[in-house]
């Protein structure tokens, strides 16, 4: 078995620049080494060999790489290692190694075996995740008092990320999302110079990374300091969905059941609000809530913002049963998940002809049309599954009252 770290990727048109390197999570998990070009090899008869790429003079000149990065066996020796095993099947994990041919079935089996180990976080991993959460919490604390009409999405991003780095974060776990007003309805909106207006919702989805381990938090704020009555009603529905889904995150529960609880809570709330019509459970069976809750309830987080093997082998997503749900497995002690319900008024979905026909009797389309400038709301926390109630790792980041 070979597990590749991956190589640097050049920035197009810039001969001496590369994107920030991050080793493939499978390699990083097994070696705790974040250098390009490494290949970890395993033979059940002979054990592990860590093949590393020699540090070049240019790397020392431009990047400050040291001989400490060369601890291991030179990758030049990999050819000899492979030649001695040329009659045996190879499985290549980690970053792609197109010059080698591996057995797909063997790769799938080994990857799932590794995923099963990686899903359950040990104390070292949890310590790193808590450090990432701490930096992220500091970032959200820094921006909360700054949110006001006239402030821009970009300004918030700058202050948030600066606080991440001041408080121990190594990098951002993913591209920071800040959307104000109608932009808050775009699930992954990149910040712009748009200033917040009076009455806007401001959605911030961000996280720091520490030694490869990620945090992923979302909060939604009123730009004016207080929600309007309409915004407060929707926020209460999202918060109820978050609390009920969180309470259900216990060992043995199927993730799709957690999603179902959140979806039903949202459907129930939107019936009372007047955007949906009908029995909440029947609406969820039809998927009507997805007009306003168009994503899954969450995902695994850990070594990267989307962690290991979120769908068990043999389970295929069903187009008839939560088609947007990307996680399908039972919860176990040591798993870490995001729980992130939201409600959005997305013009593209409100104007979608197929949705209009499919849910013509389930959605108050006229009411939805009147809310096209509403934007969106999401609450996202990171949960550690324990023997008892789940531990909210992101509990230091306050919700809006």
Spell out what each predicted region is.
Residues 1-401:
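Active-site neighborhoods and metal-handling regions in enzymes and metal-associated proteins
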């Amino acid at each position: 078995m070979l597990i590749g770290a991956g190589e640097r990727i050049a920035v197009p048109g810039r001969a001496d620049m590369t994107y920030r390197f991050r080793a493939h999570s499978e390699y990083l998990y097994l070696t705790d080494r974040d250098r390009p070009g490494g290949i970890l090899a395993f033979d059940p008869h002979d054990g592990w060999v860590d093949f590393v790429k020699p540090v070049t003079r240019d790397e020392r000149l431009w990047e400050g790489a040291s001989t400490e990065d060369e601890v291991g066996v030179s990758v030049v020796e990999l050819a000899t290692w492979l030649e001695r095993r040329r009659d045996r099947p190879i499985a290549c994990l980690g970053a792609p190694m197109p010059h080698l041919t591996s057995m797909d079935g063997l790769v799938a089996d080994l990857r799932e075996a590794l995923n099963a180990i990686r899903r359950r976080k040990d104390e070292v991993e949890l310590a790193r995740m808590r450090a990432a959460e701490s930096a992220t919490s500091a970032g959200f604390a820094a921006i909360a008092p700054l949110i006001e009409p006239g402030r821009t999405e970009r300004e918030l991003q700058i202050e948030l990320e600066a606080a991440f780095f001041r408080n121990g974060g190594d990098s951002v776990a993913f591209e920071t999302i800040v959307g104000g007003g109608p932009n808050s309805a775009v699930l992954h909106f990149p910040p712009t110079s748009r200033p917040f207006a009076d009455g806007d919702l401001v959605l911030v989805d961000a996280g720091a990374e520490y030694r490869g381990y990620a945090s992923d938090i979302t909060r939604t704020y009123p730009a004016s300091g207080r929600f309007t009555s309409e915004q407060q009603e929707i926020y209460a529905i999202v918060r109820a969905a978050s609390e009920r889904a969180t309470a259900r995150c216990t060992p043995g529960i199927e993730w799709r059941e957690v999603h179902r609880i959140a979806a039903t809570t949202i459907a129930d709330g939107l019936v009372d609000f007047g955007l949906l019509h009908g029995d909440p459970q029947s609406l969820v069976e039809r998927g009507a809530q997805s007009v306003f809750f168009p994503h899954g309830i969450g995902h695994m987080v850990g070594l990267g913002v989307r962690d290991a093997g979120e769908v068990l082998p043999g389970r295929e997503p069903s187009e008839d049963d939560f088609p947007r749900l990307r996680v399908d497995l039972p919860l176990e002690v040591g798993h870490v998940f995001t729980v992130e319900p939201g409600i959005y008024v997305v013009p593209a979905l409100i104007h979608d002809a197929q949705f209009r026909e499919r849910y013509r009797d389930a959605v108050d389309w006229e009411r939805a049309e009147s809310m096209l400038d509403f934007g969106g709301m999401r609450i996202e926390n990171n949960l550690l599954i324990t023997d008892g109630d789940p531990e909210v790792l992101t509990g230091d980041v306050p919700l809006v009252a």
